[in-house]
């Protein structure tokens, strides 16, 4: 399980859990104007 934390250019924070890296990058690519993101492995 991965936790994806995304901060967009408006300062909004989006936190989501996904099953694998493919889904994590699909999520990241679906959001416009990303300022930064972190992908962490969680149990």
Which residues make up each language-model segment?
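Short, mixed-charge low-complexity intrinsically disordered segments
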Residues: 29-43
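Hydrophobic beta-strand residues in large extracellular and virion-surface proteins
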Residues: 4-6, 18, 37-39
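A short, sequence-level motif marking secondary-structure junctions
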Residues: 18-24
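Short aromatic-glycine-(Arg/Gly/Cys) micro-motifs in beta-strand/loop hairpins
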Residues: 1-14, 29
């Amino acid at each position: 399980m991965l936790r994806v934390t995304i901060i967009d250019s408006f300062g909004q924070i989006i936190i989501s859990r996904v099953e694998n890296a493919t889904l994590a990058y699909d999520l990241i690519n679906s959001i416009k104007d990303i300022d930064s993101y972190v992908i962490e492995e969680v149990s």
